[in-house]
Amino acid sequence: MTRIDDKFAQLAKDGKKAFVAYVMAGDPNYETSLEVVKGLPAAGVDVIELGLPFTDPMADGPTIQLAGQRALEAGMTLQKTLDLARAFRKDDQTTPIVMMGYYNPIYSRGVDRFLAEAKDAGIDGLIVVDLPPEEDSELCLPAQAAGLNFIRLATPTTDDKRLPRVLQNTSGFVYYVSITGITGAAEAQAVDVGPEVARIKSAAALPVIVGFGVNTPEKSKAIAEVADGVVVGSAIVGKIGAGQSVSDVLAFVKTLADGAHSV
């Protein structure tokens, strides 16, 4: 059992939905980013998604692309992302952290080395958006052997023929991308999401968390009503990008978390 498994088991026992927050590691700089991440649990965040900055983030919309650029320009690296997670773990041993990013930085570091370091830093799971299930032997299977969850994305275009392949080695939870396209580009609609969540849950005994296009407390509540939880990324990252104070960012996060938890 990972921290992710424990968290979702506890939420299910309590009859609660999960609120997951995405932030880019090192945006706008290491110190501010760490302060934000440290404040997320008290703002109601159940699982933290920590973005790994990358030079070619093909699945990300402009808001998160800019966050990655800011982080890279401030000197953020894979090593510093691991350092940030380790610093967070000094004060918090229970909140799960999922590292989300692309395969190239991991491959460049060496898979075995990366997995050992990630585990040691307190990372609990990985989302690697550019590794399809056909490449499970590259990272997915070694990650799970190392005790990390490997979380897959399902989309509206993942048909019934493809879905079992996507879910085959998925663990922790399934991240349902509620819209086609890049992050932050459109809004999720609960009426569309509900049947898709049911379809995925019928194929895998895992929580289904919905992201992409959730940007208000009302939307967070609406999506949480038809899923096991909700992910918000671009809306939070946009506040950081606008130069809002850490306290203002966390206050906004709390409104989103309260929306999801009000179900």
UniProtKB/Swiss-Prot annotation:
Transport among keywords: no
InterPro entries hit by this protein: Aldolase_TIM, RibuloseP-bd_barrel, Trp_synthase_alpha_AS, Trp_synthase_suA
Domain of life: Bacteria
Enzyme Commission number(s) from the entry: 4.2.1.20
PROSITE patterns: TRP_SYNTHASE_ALPHA (PS00167)
Active site, renumbered: E49, D60
Catalysed conversion reaction: (1S,2R)-1-C-(indol-3-yl)glycerol 3-phosphate + L-serine = D-glyceraldehyde 3-phosphate + L-tryptophan + H2O
Keywords: Amino-acid biosynthesis, Aromatic amino acid biosynthesis, Lyase, Tryptophan biosynthesis
Gene3D superfamilies membership: Aldolase class I
Regions that span the bilayer: none
Pfam families: Trp_syntA
Enzyme class, broadest EC rank: lyase
One GO location term (cellular component): cytosol
GO molecular function: tryptophan synthase activity
PANTHER family documented for this protein: TRYPTOPHAN SYNTHASE ALPHA CHAIN, CHLOROPLASTIC, TRYPTOPHAN SYNTHASE, ALPHA CHAIN
Function according to Swiss-Prot or TrEMBL: The alpha subunit is responsible for the aldol cleavage of indoleglycerol phosphate to indole and glyceraldehyde 3-phosphate.
Family: Belongs to the TrpA family.
Name of this protein: Tryptophan synthase alpha chain
Lineage, top ranks: Bacteria, Pseudomonadati, Pseudomonadota, Alphaproteobacteria, Rhodobacterales
